[in-house]
């Protein structure tokens, strides 16, 4: 992305941050509009999150915000999560849209009234579905946080790598 969370991620001076996006243009925007003091703390690279050019267990944590709700097919989300399992040593933090709240209900109602489009790029994922996928990819849910409980679709999960599973 464009570095929206880089400030938070670099608060700890001992933390080394790698930022990755499938679009070099997005990375360049982040580098252009953030202070040099910040960007010098971050190594950026262009890559697909489905195939990261990193060795197994290369990073302590993966912070993946505002990506999963763009992936409509379970098999694609599972592939992504398995790649995160491979590359992370311990934890993964992800955010996405989930059901079970007012906004998801309103969105479903809105979508049912729309003319069907060939392409859709944002999805409300059922909680039960995504949590099953986390498990299949080798993660245990350590915690989750709803942005505004029972109202907003945004949920952030902290996933812990289950060492008994090799993906």
Predicted regions and their residues:
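Class I (Rossmann-like) S-adenosyl-L-methionine-dependent methyltransferase catalytic domain
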Residues: 1-51, 75, 79, 93-167
């Amino acid at each position: 992305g464009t570095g929206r969370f880089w400030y938070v991620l670099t608060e700890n001076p001992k933390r080394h941050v790698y930022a990755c996006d499938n679009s070099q243009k997005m990375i360049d925007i982040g580098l252009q509009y953030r202070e040099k003091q910040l960007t010098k703390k971050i190594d950026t690279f262009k890559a697909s999150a489905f195939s990261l050019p990193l060795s197994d267990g290369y990073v302590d944590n993966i912070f993946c915000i505002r990506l999963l709700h763009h992936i409509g097919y379970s098999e694609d989300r599972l592939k992504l999560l398995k790649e995160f399992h491979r590359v992370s040593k311990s934890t993964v933090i992800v955010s996405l849209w989930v059901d079970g709240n007012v906004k998801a209900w309103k969105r479903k109602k809105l979508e049912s009234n729309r003319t069907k489009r060939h392409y859709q790029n944002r999805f409300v994922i059922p909680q039960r579905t995504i949590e099953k996928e986390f498990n299949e990819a080798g993660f245990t849910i350590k915690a989750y946080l709803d942005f505004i409980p029972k109202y907003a679709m945004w949920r952030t999960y902290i996933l812990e790598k289950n060492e008994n599973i090799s993906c």
